[in-house]
Design a protein with these regions (language model features):
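Hydrophobic packing and interface segments
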Residues: 2-750
Length: 750
């Protein structure tokens, strides 16, 4: 059987060939710029011996965690690569060129491994650069606010450029090689990146919030000592957690959103290319992404304080608006001069408008300057209960506004492509997602800015830097909390748009004429899909609670039993808490992932493709609502606490402050563990559904499909999937699987 590869270059115009080469060159340029910034950051001084010692401990803890995580998931990745190969084999019958099934399977499995490796690289390098940048920001703050701001932002830009460069490079190379067969391979690429992001988000979220909750409850509430006080045994684990959760986790999360939106746009674009004969449906999204890389590089140099002490948020917004302007200008030029259709321009511009709207909404509900956070701060005067109630109200309200904004963007796509087939409307939704994540470089720079400044502030506290440096770092840290909240909102919105576009690809690929909720199988599957985000959130939040319990006991024990720790004459055993966090995160890692991978397979084989579509709709709807609620409620509680720590209602140590700390402690696992992890959950379930669907159908004459139905084999698949899910959930709820082991060691130590 003949093999047909690189067919795209044969049918492309001269401009399109040069454009594809140009996209690859710009992707590589983004990677080279990341290398240039890395050298620039590493040349900056690290400060005193004590600062270097603390930074070294943070790096050691972070690298130990990620190394152990990669070892934990290695076998599962290998097994899934085999599974992905066979899904490609089954899908190979739909090859546009009649390529052999083994080639499609090999391409999809190779794409899966490439996506997984790229996602892991983005997370690993991004985290390591954050851990290199934190001590340098702390040192720079001793002399210059402007310099500290610049180092912190450019440290995050390194991760942004890696995300842009690797995501664009991977998608473009797959398209160039496979062309019309690219959708079959791109699904593997997207699945690999999304799966690693899920692991990073779940594991990193459990680690960071278990450490944070343990450190805050014993340190701030019980002992009344400041955050990052070196006497607290959980303080190093807390600082490590900022990196593994907010750097490695968010970097992998945004990377997989970047991957999945481009995968969805190219899959739908290829369908339109086949029907219209125009390559612009595929080339345009790639050109837009390339323009985003260029805009992010240029805008980096506008993020600097125009005067010493200027609000850092103004400088960051300046860079964001410049990148947005350059991006929209490029959309106009590509839509007008290349595609000759301004609907491309309008659809991608809606994505930029959505990103800006999400920025504003998140800022409104989580900023210390806005009414919602001020109301929560006021409620702390009457205790923890009213603090919790007030935060819940803010979170619920923000969810409504976010879903309205996302719905408006989909409505805008429908209006832009009105009068056309539904595939054009969904392609417009995919372009909206492409436009929203055009500013990926800026988004990740903003996100990494938060943990870098938080770590720098912690290093300054522990090493006893002068008040001027502490004030500078406290100001940068406050801005970093807002930027982290903003990027969480963007990640959630991008997850929904990507999921909707993938849903459309599923709808088109398997020729579903309707998805009828009156059908009992579809409705039941819709209900089950809606319950999955709640079960997933329960697993992750309970994991944080279990780990935090043992961290709290360990910190209390060291205060009570290790002579000199409370007096500050002896360092606590930081490594013990780091070890507890690492062990907890790894032991709780696989159950949420198995739930995401196996639940759509079970539903699809049991009830069929239409019911699977209903299941996906339930996951997308409830997952988005729950993610926004948790992210914004948690962010609002966090910043309400910070306003009180700045002196409001009695300041640190007051009853209002203790109530605020309780609110923040409840909100932490919501905004940094369960909420963010729902983004990759939504996309993993969508991608598994599209990938595994090829095994749920049999191709018939004329190019159609019929479902396999219930056979002994399919019933066996369903039973095995359900047994693994139930068994893993049951094991995860048994405390002896993690807790008793640690407790026994603690008792022996006594």
């Amino acid at each position: 059987m003949p093999i047909t590869l690189f067919e795209g270059f044969r049918v492309a115009t001269a401009f399109e060939k040069y454009a594809l080469i140009g996209v690859v060159v710009i992707a590589i340029l983004g990677l080279l710029y990341a290398a240039f910034l890395t050298r620039q950051i590493l040349r900056e001084p690290e400060g005193t011996d004590k600062m270097r010692h603390i930074a070294s401990a943070i790096r050691s803890g972070g690298n130990a965690y990620l190394s152990r995580q990669f070892r934990t998931i290695l076998l599962l990745i290998f097994l899934l690569a085999i599974f992905v190969f066979f899904t490609g084999w089954f899908a190979g019958g739909t090859s546009a060129y009649g390529n052999p099934k083994w080639l499609i399977g090999l391409g999809r499995a190779g794409g899966f491994l490439m996506g997984a490796i790229f996602s892991a690289l983005v997370g690993y390098i991004g985290m390591n650069m954050a851990m290199q940048g934190n001590v340098r920001v702390a040192q720079a703050a001793r002399s210059s606010f402007t310099k500290a701001l610049q180092i912190a932002y450019r440290t995050g830009t390194i991760t942004g450029m890696l995300t842009d460069g690797l995501g664009l490079l991977g998608g473009t190379i797959i398209f160039i090689i496979f062309f019309r067969d690219a959708p079959l391979v791109l699904l593997g690429f997207g699945f690999g990146g999304t799966l690693i992001a899920l692991f990073m988000r779940v594991g990193g979220g459990i680690y960071t919030k278990a450490a944070d909750v343990g450190a805050d409850l014993v340190g701030k509430v019980e002992k009344g000592i400041p955050e990052d006080d070196p006497r607290n045994a959980a303080v190093i684990a807390d600082l490590v957690g900022d990196n593994v959760g907010d750097c490695a986790g968010m970097a992998a999360d945004i990377f997989e959103s970047y991957e999945v939106t481009i995968v969805a746009a190219m899959i739908l674009g290829l369908i339109l290319t086949v029907s219209t004969g125009q390559l612009s449906w595929i080339i345009f999204p790639l050109l837009v992404r390339a323009a985003g890389v260029f805009a992010s590089i240029v805008s980096t140099y506008s993020v600097r304080a125009l005067r010493e002490g200027e609000n850092a948020m103004k400088a960051i917004h300046r860079g964001y608006w410049l990148a947005a302007f350059l991006s929209v200008l490029s959309f106009l030029l590509f839509g007008w001069l290349y595609a000759h259709d301004l609907r491309f321009f309008w659809a991608t511009s809606v994505g930029v408008a959505l990103a800006i709207a999400i920025n504003y909404l998140t800022d409104y509900y989580t900023s210390t300057e806005r009414t919602p956070v001020k109301e929560i701060a006021k409620s702390t005067k009457t205790g923890p209960a009213t603090t919790i109630l007030s935060g819940l109200g803010v979170g619920y309200e923000s969810t409504v506004m976010a879903i309205i904004v996302i719905a408006l963007s989909i409505i805008a796509s429908a209006l832009i492509w009105r009068g056309t087939d539904i595939i054009y409307i969904f392609y417009g939704v995919a372009l909206c997602g492409i436009g929203q994540l055009t500013l990926t470089g800026n988004n990740i720079s903003m996100d990494a800015f938060g943990p870098v400044c938080d770590n720098a502030n912690g290093i300054a506290e522990m090493s006893g830097l002068e008040p001027k440096a502490r004030k500078t770092l406290a100001d940068l840290d406050a801005v970093g909390n807002t930027t982290k909240a903003i990027t969480k909102g963007i990640a959630i919105a991008s997850a929904v748009l990507a999921a909707v576009a993938l849903f459309a690809a599923f709808y088109e690929d398997y020729q579903l004429e309707t998805i009828n909720l009156i059908q009992w199988k579809v409705f039941v599957s819709f209900l089950i899909g809606g319950s999955i985000p709640f079960l997933f959130s329960s697993l992750t939040i309970r994991a944080v609670g279990r780990a935090a319990y043992f961290i709290i006991n360990e910190v209390r024990w060291q205060f009570a039993n290790v002579k000199g720790v409370w007096e500050g004459t002896v360092d606590p055993d930081y490594g013990k808490v780091v070890s507890i966090c690492t062990g907890a995160a790894q032991k709780e890692l696989l159950t949420p992932a198995l739930l995401a991978i196996l639940s759509p397979i079970a539903i699809g084989f049991l009830f069929g493709l239409e019911a699977l579509a209903g299941f996906l709709a339930g996951v997308i709807l409830v997952g988005q609502l729950l993610a926004v609620f948790m992210a914004n409620a948690g962010g609002a509680w966090d910043n309400a606490k910070k306003t009180i720590e700045d002196g409001l209602y009695g300041g640190k140590g007051s009853e209002a402050h203790k109530a605020a700390v309780v609110g923040d402690t409840v909100g932490d696992p919501l905004k940094d563990t369960a909420g963010p992890a729902l983004n990759p959950l939504i996309k993993v379930i969508n991608l598994v559904s599209v990938i595994a669907a090829s095994m749920m159908v049999v191709q018939v004459a004329g190019g159609g499909f019929r479902e396999r139905g219930l056979t002994p084999v399919t019933i066996g698949v369903v039973v095995v999937c359900l047994a693994i899910i139930v068994g893993s959930v049951w094991v995860s709820k048994k405390e002896e699987s993690f807790g008793r082991e640690i407790e026994e060691k603690s008792e022996a130590k006594k």
